[in-house]
Amino acid sequence: MVAIKNLVLVALTAVTALAMPSPLEERAATWTCMNEQKNPKTNKYENKRLLYNQNNAESNAHHAPLSDGKTGSSYPHWFTNGYDGDGKILKGRTPIKWGNSDCDRPPKHSKNGDGKNDHYLLEFPTFPDGHQYNFDSKKPKEDPGPARVIYTYPNKVFCGIVAHTRENQGDLKLCSH
């Protein structure tokens, strides 16, 4: 009888432990970028909503070389964010505010981009399906698509995702998340 009571007590304890809520896993942010793309059937531009997973974009950034334009494709390269190399805002430009002090500070970008005290933003292609961009592709280089993951040099801190407003040309605008 004692054995049965102990067995019931162990079973109830196990059920209670399994029924306790576990912490929820934080989901990766989804970034939404708007981009005009030409419809091949109508030959007219249409607004497309492109979705990017932040974990994939961060992975793209971490797999990219830590260089400024020194690859076959020229990616990654400096994202000026409206600044010159000395951290002064260029006339008529408004820098994107990322909400992260590493990303928001004015850059220091030496002539070759790898000075001892350099800190600036890099841009690297990112894709909705998360595949890695072939940064060593030469002419014809792989299509980088409309979106870029932005991160810091030299620490590779993720800042955000920006996209061209029309296909792979024009201004880069901050995507929403």
Curated annotation (Swiss-Prot):
A single GO molecular function term of this UniProt record: RNA binding
Catalytic residues in the record: 77, 123, 164
Enzyme class, first EC level, given as a word: hydrolase
Record-annotated disulphide pairs: 33-175, 103-159
Signal peptide location: 1-27
Location(s), subcellular: Secreted
Regions of compositional bias (Basic and acidic residues) in chain numbering: 102-117
Spans annotated as Disordered: 98-117
GO cellular component, one term: extracellular region
InterPro entries: Fun_ribotoxin, N1-like, Ribonuclease/ribotoxin, RNase_U2
Enzyme Commission code(s) on record: 3.1.27.-
Keywords: Disulfide bond, Hydrolase, Nuclease, Protein synthesis inhibitor, Secreted, Signal
Gene3D superfamilies, A to Z: Microbial ribonucleases
GO biological process terms on file: negative regulation of cytoplasmic translation
Function (record text): Clavin has the same substrate specificity as alpha-sarcin. It is specific for purines in both single- and double-stranded RNA. Its toxic action on eukaryotic cells is the result of cleavage of a single phosphodiester bond in the 60S subunit of ribosomes.
Family assignment from sequence similarity: Belongs to the ribonuclease U2 family.
Protein name stated in the entry: Ribonuclease clavin
Naturally occurring in which organism (per UniProt): Aspergillus clavatus
Lineage: Eukaryota, Fungi, Dikarya, Ascomycota, Pezizomycotina
Record gene name: cla
